[in-house]
């Protein structure tokens, strides 16, 4: 799928342009104002700021890891001339930014006082909007008459989870491949059943430089048969110990791959030579 048609050239424009308008419509009807707080490894931040710019009832604050997003995306976030948009550089990784955001939302008193809301894929509206293009793509590719598979470059697991949710809704998807870069915790988990945290390594695909994928909890919820207490226990143990292992972990129709920085330029060159089509480093991680 070509998902670079939005104003910031990120696939997240498809969902966030809708979500920004939904926020504006509902808030105006209610006479309310919200403070949106989000974390980004690059593409979410620029797409969210663009979607919320100049919205009268929204203040948006986006945290990004200093020196770990692409120069283009940093400029997209920091050069918007809009009084309600705020981009904040954090000394750390995307996971550090995400932990700060989660901490704010977990502080009930602070959350209510500031009327916090989210545009990250923590917000279910983001995932719902992304389900749509999987349905459209599958139908155009011949579903249900022919099996359709998707290989998805994956960082925070929101996009590929939208594909999985589409399958759960009845879309005849044959296979989903979770493409990772050198920050390969998801690849290792699908291969071994063990989640084991490592340091975040800067790569040629910076929007995927993530170790703890928020949306993976949603997949675990289904794997653990809807037992939310069990999911909480697993994730708390994982965050405190840095690892968690399942016996016989398997998600039907899902697998994973890992692409290193050495392989990314080779894949880009091979795709160009064979198809005369130029893919970006993130797409290369799922090719």
Give residue spans per PLM region:
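PLP-dependent amino-acid enzyme catalytic core
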Residues: 1-287
